[in-house]
């Protein structure tokens, strides 16, 4: 994605093209009419990464053209949130004044929120010392005095200095509810906050009037688990990445939700546990009796590689399947199996990444 293709005046055209392409791609499955969820045309991305270029006394952000690999200067980044764009020039001006902060800094990562919090990670090709820490504390105080709610992380080879926390607290509006989410630096979060809210509302709408329990695979920080909890008696969710599991546990407590249980294990291991092929100590340690759950609905949000055949077969055992996909190609492959036993009753496009070819899709399937 280059600056030249990001024109808000062309936003609707590129969205219509995506919708047409996605509908055509899945036409063989007799899908219902596509529900299209748009993004803001600018300032939609809650995180951004920039290389830092030093040129004499000058210092500025750069990105690289993916095709030509040539660098280009970035003073304003149209996709990034207003919070990131407001902070970008103030940060560089402040860092330029400090030899300690400036020396061998090569990258800055921003993680912002709709709630107003922002986290800045400053990356260096040198080890950081107490002098850096004191200068960074002063920088943080200076920027917060200007109205930001900001924390700073300094990173170098095999070291990390956190001032004063390595996460932000996001608040997402889902219909009439406000849900609180802890989002940790360097762990996965939905990049487009507005579209993330629309995805949650769509998932809640699809599962209204559900009976029994929900099983969720690949739950991340509990993004969907928390929003869907009110539609089910209980939610049992799996996630392998420890930082995401820790965030999910925090989020469950922060939202006072008492019917969500998170297990740290892979989808493949969970499939073995459900089928009784193996026993897992972590299930016993958490006093989780899989047989006590009455899961009629399963929610899957797999990585780009999709689900393996064994997981697809396991998923087919549920009456209703909700599948969020960041890769339509692997979604299509998985639907070739799932559509043998289930009909697609809802079909959605979420424009998480405007001005790119990336398409986030959602399907809801019910047993034939």
From Swiss-Prot:
Catalytic activity: uridine(54) in tRNA + S-adenosyl-L-methionine = 5-methyluridine(54) in tRNA + S-adenosyl-L-homocysteine + H(+); uridine(341) in tmRNA + S-adenosyl-L-methionine = 5-methyluridine(341) in tmRNA + S-adenosyl-L-homocysteine + H(+)
PROSITE patterns: SAM_MT_RNA_M5U, TRMA_1, TRMA_2
Pfam families: tRNA_U5-meth_tr
Binding site for S-adenosyl-L-methionine: 190, 218, 223, 239, 301
Active site, per annotation: 326 (nucleophile), 360 (proton acceptor)
InterPro entries found in the cross-reference section: MeTrfase_TrmA_AS, MeTrfase_TrmA_CS, SAM-dependent_MTases_sf, TrmA_MeTrfase, U5_MeTrfase_fam
Gene Ontology terms for molecular function: rRNA binding; tRNA (uracil(54)-C5)-methyltransferase activity, S-adenosyl methionine-dependent; tRNA binding
GO BP, sorted A to Z: tRNA methylation
Entry's EC annotation: 2.1.1.-, 2.1.1.35
Superkingdom of the source species: Bacteria
A GO cellular component entry from the record: cytosol
Name of the top EC class for this enzyme: transferase
Entry keyword set: Methyltransferase, S-adenosyl-L-methionine, Transferase, tRNA processing
Functional description taken from the UniProt entry: Dual-specificity methyltransferase that catalyzes the formation of 5-methyluridine at position 54 (m5U54) in all tRNAs, and that of position 341 (m5U341) in tmRNA (transfer-mRNA).
Family indicated by similarity: Belongs to the class I-like SAM-binding methyltransferase superfamily. RNA M5U methyltransferase family. TrmA subfamily.
HAMAP family (UniProt xref): RNA_methyltr_TrmA
Name of the protein: tRNA/tmRNA (uracil-C(5))-methyltransferase
């Amino acid at each position: 994605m280059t600056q030249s293709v990001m024109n808000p005046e062309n936003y609707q055209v590129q969205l219509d093209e995506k919708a047409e392409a996605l509908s055509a791609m899945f036409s063989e499955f007799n899908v219902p009419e596509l529900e299209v969820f748009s993004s803001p045309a600018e300032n939609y991305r809650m995180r951004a990464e920039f290389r830092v270029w030093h040129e004499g006394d000058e210092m500025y952000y750069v990105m690289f053209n993916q095709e030509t690999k040539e660098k280009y200067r970035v003073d304003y980044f149209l996709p990034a949130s207003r919070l990131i764009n407001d902070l970008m020039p103030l940060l560089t001006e402040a860092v330029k004044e400090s030899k300690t902060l400036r020396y061998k800094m090569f990258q800055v990562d921003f993680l912002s929120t709709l709630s107003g919090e922002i986290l800045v990670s400053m990356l260096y090709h040198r080890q950081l010392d107490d002098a850096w820490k004191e200068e960074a504390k002063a920088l943080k105080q200076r920027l917060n005095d200007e109205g930001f709610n900001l924390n700073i992380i300094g990173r170098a080879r095999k070291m990390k200095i956190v001032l004063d926390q390595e996460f932000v607290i996001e608040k997402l509006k889902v219909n009439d509810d406000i849900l609180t989410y802890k989002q940790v630096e360097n762990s996965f979060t939905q990049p487009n906050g507005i579209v993330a809210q629309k995805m949650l509302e769509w998932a809640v709408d699809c599962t209204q009037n559900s009976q029994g329990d929900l099983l969720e695979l690949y739950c991340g920080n509990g993004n969907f688990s928390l929003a869907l909890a009110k539609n089910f008696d209980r939610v049992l969710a799996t996630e392998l990445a420890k930082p995401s599991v820790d965030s999910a546990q925090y989020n469950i407590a922060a939202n006072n939700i008492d019917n969500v249980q998170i297990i740290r294990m892979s989808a493949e291991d969970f499939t073995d546990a459900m089928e009784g092929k193996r026993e897992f100590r972590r299930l016993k340690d958490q006093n989780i009796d899989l047989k006590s759950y009455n899961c009629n609905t399963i929610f899957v949000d797999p990585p780009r590689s999709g689900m393996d055949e064994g997981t697809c077969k396991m998923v087919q055992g549920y009456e209703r399947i909700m599948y969020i996909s960041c890769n339509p190609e692997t979604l299509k492959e998985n639907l070739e199996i799932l559509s043998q036993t289930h009909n697609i009753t809802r079909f959605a496009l979420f424009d998480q990444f405007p001005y790119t070819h990336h398409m986030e899709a959602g399907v809801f399937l019910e047993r034939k």
